Amino acid sequence: MKFLKIFVSLIFVLVLAGCGRVQPIMDVENTPVAYDLQKKQVKMAIIDSAVSRGWVVKKAESNEVELEFMARTHKATIRVPYSEKFFSILYVSSENLKADAKGNIHRNYNRWVNNLNVDIQKKISVIANSN
């Protein structure tokens, strides 16, 4: 009886541990640029923040930056459309991140996107305060 309780408890713990690996894909949409900046300054904040976090700039156009992040065998690609008033971080594709048709992905992707978002906002603030 005691063995059965331990076995059931162990299975329960393993099931709970596995539940948190995938989460809904986090898109950051229309984040306001709270300062009066030019579009090129917002672009610079996005690129500088991305590079400092290990993202690689794949394309940098006048209204959008495409970024790629690789960690071991995992790869994520995002688009960052921007203007002088707003920016967004949008999922494009991934490899080995457990992405599924329901819009779920490994939680590390959301952590990477959140860190990038926070860094972009900090960099925008630094640029605005240096003017």
Predicted segments — roles?
Residues 20-131:
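Ser/Thr-rich, low-complexity intrinsically disordered terminal regions
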Residues 1-8:
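Bacterial N-terminal signal peptides that target proteins for export
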Residues 10-13:
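Short, linear, compositionally biased motifs with a strong N-terminal bias
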Residues 15-18:
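C-terminal motif of bacterial Sec signal peptides marking the signal peptidase cleavage site
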